[in-house]
Amino acid sequence: MTDLQTQMKIAVAQEAIGEIKDGMILGLGSGSTAALMIKSLGEKLKEGSLKEIIGVPTSFQGEVLASQLGIPLRAFSAVSKIDLAIDGADEVDPNFQLIKGGGACHVQEKLVASIADRFVVVVDSTKIVEKLNLEFKLPVEVLPAAWKLVQKELNDLGAKSDLRMAEKKAGPIVTDQGNLVLDVQFADGISDPQNLEKQINNFPGVLENGLFVNLTDEVLVGEIKNGVSSVNRLKKA
């Protein structure tokens, strides 16, 4: 990550804190930008400028970080609604459709986003794209016994897919749910995210894929202009 990208992430994480109000049940996203937001939230709670916040983590990593910062937490299964969810994304298209799952947390992230009254996405400007999947591969979480079957189904759709391998252990990445991840690339990108999301999720052995369709309410984009970081707020037309 470049210094400029870090500046953009910090700026947008700070902007996101302004969305949080006392007493909220808050979906805590995963990834580097969300982690910066969680750290800032911990500071606000410690100094007393925010109060009575309950966080619902979307990953084990986020749960550990929030716990270390003293943020009160509640499991997803223990809540019926979430006031606000704030999370990052790997790609955002002009219609606010997303690809998420670079950290293999997209199952929990989508659960939290789906019951949130508002879902705000925080990204730096490098994540804004005209079309999904031309650069970033689409993660698909699969049951371990089914990954080859799902890979064949994806190949039949015209996609190329690879089993995501771990960097600091022998073998594949294992998700918080104990599953594997296929990273999927369509040569011409994804033209119809809504249809593809449903199509992939209908394959036997698929738990969830990283397309987030019609969930996002607002996108906060960190930018650098004339060497100064700023935040651009994008809202649905």
Swiss-Prot record:
Top-rank taxon: Bacteria
- GO:BP terms for this protein? D-ribose metabolic process; pentose-phosphate shunt, non-oxidative branch
Asked if the record carries the keyword GTP-binding, the reply is: no
Report which reactions are catalysed by this protein: aldehydo-D-ribose 5-phosphate = D-ribulose 5-phosphate
> TM spans, by residue?
none
Give me the residues that bind substrate, please: 30-33, 87-90, 100-103, 127
Query: Could you say which enzyme class this protein belongs to?
Result: isomerase
Which positions are catalytic residues?
Answer: 109
- Enzyme Commission code: 5.3.1.6
Keywords of the record, alphabetical order, are: Isomerase
The pathway is: Carbohydrate degradation; pentose phosphate pathway; D-ribose 5-phosphate from D-ribulose 5-phosphate (non-oxidative stage): step 1/1
One GO term describing the cellular component: cytosol
MF (Gene Ontology): ribose-5-phosphate isomerase activity
Looking up PANTHER family in the UniProt record yields: RIBOSE-5-PHOSPHATE ISOMERASE
Tell me how this protein assembles.
Answer: Homodimer.
What the entry lists under HAMAP family is as follows:
Rib_5P_isom_A
Summarizing the function annotation, the protein's role is: Catalyzes the reversible conversion of ribose-5-phosphate to ribulose 5-phosphate.
Query: Per the similarity annotation, which family is this?
Result: Belongs to the ribose 5-phosphate isomerase family.
> In its UniProt entry, what is this protein called?
Ribose-5-phosphate isomerase A
Q: Which organism is it from?
A: Prochlorococcus marinus (strain SARG / CCMP1375 / SS120)
